[in-house]
Design a protein with these regions (language model features):
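Transmembrane alpha-helical segments of polytopic membrane transport and secretion proteins
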Residues: 1-42
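Residue-level signal for discrete positions within transmembrane alpha-helices
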Residues: 97, 101, 137-140, 144, ...
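Faces of alpha-helical transmembrane segments in polytopic inner-membrane proteins
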Residues: 112-115, 139-147, 184-210, 241-242, ...
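Transmembrane alpha-helix signature in integral membrane proteins
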Residues: 92-122, 251
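Membrane-interfacial helix termini and adjacent extracytoplasmic/periplasmic loops
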Residues: 66-95, 150-199, 281
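Transmembrane alpha-helices
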Residues: 145, 205-209, 216, 225, ...
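Cytoplasmic-entry segments and transmembrane alpha-helices of multi-pass inner-membrane transporters
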Residues: 35, 115-154
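Interhelical loop and adjacent transmembrane-helix boundary motif
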Residues: 265-302
């Protein structure tokens, strides 16, 4: 009879280790197809944006060649025609609309971003249970509201309340040129438009900030608590520094929507071809509302 020799420890380990497999860099056919589809999709977006920029550049070249720098520095918008309907003289200037766009968007960011960040912090670290689910659902739903609803709400409901606050700001801060008014006309001002835009961007910035704050590493939060930090101190020392980049990105996204908003601003703001730096005075406009105003009657040059 043969006696079975027990395997040594090294022989047992060598038997348990599988043979090394050959590593190949050749991708599968499915990976090649997926990569091609993704590449085509990404490049098509760049091509479409490039074609749009090229189209706008070609169409606007004639106006820029005639108006030159006055297209940005002047605020006149006049088209004179003769009896046959032919254009005899035209003057185009976007200065008033550019300033109105800047003021309305700036007011929206100043009011909306702090409220959105505080709301995101509350939803992430303080709200619990059904209250959190309800608030998150409402904020996500508000982000999908069409701008026309915000415009009508601002015109019908908000304008009276905002007019009161505008008068209050003018009363106590009227010595600052920005809050001074040449005439007591407070309705349909850049301030009211900025408040409406702030309410519009709050859901967007809140949703983005909440997602960023949710991604804060748990070990950093627990380390802050282990060192004796309170929840407020933990938020200031850990969450805010970690999510600063995401909050800035959300604010820029909200700023982009505020600067490109059309219907809501057109509903609550007078389109006046006059440079107005007084945010409480009922005159101004923005570029998007000018496009909406002139869309139906614009000539080839406009």
């Amino acid at each position: 009879m043969y006696k079975i020799q027990p395997m040594t420890l090294m022989e047992n380990r060598s038997a348990a280790i599988p043979e090394p497999r050959e590593v190949t860099t050749k991708p599968r056919r499915s990976d090649q197809i997926f990569r091609a589809v993704v590449t085509i999709g990404g490049m098509s977006s760049l091509v479409i944006l490039g074609l749009i920029a090229l189209f706008l550049s070609i169409k606007g070249f004639n106006v820029l060649r005639v108006e030159q720098l006055s297209f940005i520095t002047e605020s006149k918008w006049e088209v004179l025609q003769d009896g046959e309907g032919k254009i005899t003289e035209s003057t185009f200037g976007l200065a008033a609309m550019l300033i109105g766009t800047f003021l309305s968007a700036l007011i929206a960011v100043i009011i909306g971003v702090p409220i959105a960040v505080l709301s995101a912090l509350y939803l992430t670290f303080y709200a619990r249970g059904s209250v959190k689910k309800l608030l998150v659902s409402l904020i996500d739903l508000m982000a999908a509201f069409p701008s026309l609803l915000f415009g009508f709400w601002g015109f019908i409901v908000l304008m009276a309340s905002a007019e009161y606050w505008a008068k209050l700001l003018n009363k106590y801060l009227g010595f600052i040129p920005l809050f001074d008014v040449p005439a007591p006309i407070f309705t349909r001002s850049p301030f009211i438009a900025g408040v409406v835009l702030a309410i519009m961007i709050i859901p967007i910035v809140t949703a983005i900030s909440r997602e960023i704050f949710d991604q804060t590493p748990l070990d950093r939060i627990q380390a802050a608590y282990a060192l004796g930090a309170s929840k407020l101190a933990m938020i200031r020392a850990v969450v805010i520094p970690y999510g600063r980049g995401g909050v800035v990105g959300g604010a820029m996204l909200g700023l982009g929507r505020a600067m490109g908003e059309t219907v809501a601003v057109y509903t609550v703001l007078n389109v006046v071809y006059q440079i107005n730096w007084q945010v409480l005075f009922g005159a101004g406009g923005n570029v998007a509302s000018l496009i909406l105003l002139k869309f139906g009657e614009a000539g080839p040059q406009e």
